[in-house]
Amino acid sequence: MAEEILNREYEVEYGGKRYILRPIKAWVLQPPGKPGVVVALFRLPDGKTVRKVVMKLPP
């Protein structure tokens, strides 16, 4: 599942612009008692790094 997330391209919106990017890192964030989400880290063409939730996990 991790390779699917890292090899897929996602649409990231930042500063009013939209980018189609591949994540450089992804991880699961799941607080106790709540459904988890997959957060991915993206590097924009201008060098900035942004995070985005790319998937929600079932409870």
Swiss-Prot record:
GO cellular component: chromosome; cytoplasm
Keyword DNA-binding among record annotations: yes
GO molecular function: double-stranded DNA binding
Keywords of the record: Chromosome, Cytoplasm, DNA-binding, Methylation
Any Pfam family matching the protein: Cren7
Annotated localization: Chromosome; Cytoplasm
Transmembrane segments: none
UniProt similarity note: Belongs to the Cren7 family.
Functional note: A chromatin protein, binds double-stranded DNA without sequence specificity. Constrains negative DNA supercoils.
Full protein name: Chromatin protein Cren7
Species of the source: Pyrobaculum arsenaticum (strain DSM 13514 / JCM 11321 / PZ6)
